[in-house]
Amino acid sequence: MPELPEVEVVRTGLQQWTAGRTISEVAVLHPRAIRRHVAGATDFTARLRGMRLGDVHRRGKFLWWPLRGEQALVGHLGMSGQFRLDADPGIHTRVTFDLDRRLLFDDQRTFGGLWLDPLVDGLPTALTGIAPDPFAAEYDRRAVVATIRSRHAPVKAL
């Protein structure tokens, strides 16, 4: 599974090649890749077609692009997911996007995925329970210290 530094490298690369581009076409080649988008592949592709991708963001190991209408395209790489640019689809390609260039979402083990999620205060609703990264602008060190001092639990449970 890609660790946080690798996901940040992916975010940086995607930012350069996807931010501000419009999705002209989407194809879902494997339904498991969008399993969290319960409305299915037809709805997923219809809602994304013509959308302009905003800047790529990351919270934990999740990536997202804000879209108009207070929604976001959210992705998680799972154990083997990757985005490839200007490549031919292969046997592990799960979703393709045409944005002037071709962007592929490949996932050999299909543990990763993509979905659309409403934004609340700029954050996809599925990610509201994930704390900000210590290097993020919204990280409040004093609040974290106060929370840790007020609880008697293993660190991971905080």
Q: PLM ranges: what are they?
A:
Residues M1-R59, W64-Q71, L77, T96, ...:
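Extended, highly charged segments
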Residues L73-L158:
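Phosphate/anion-contacting hairpin/loop surfaces
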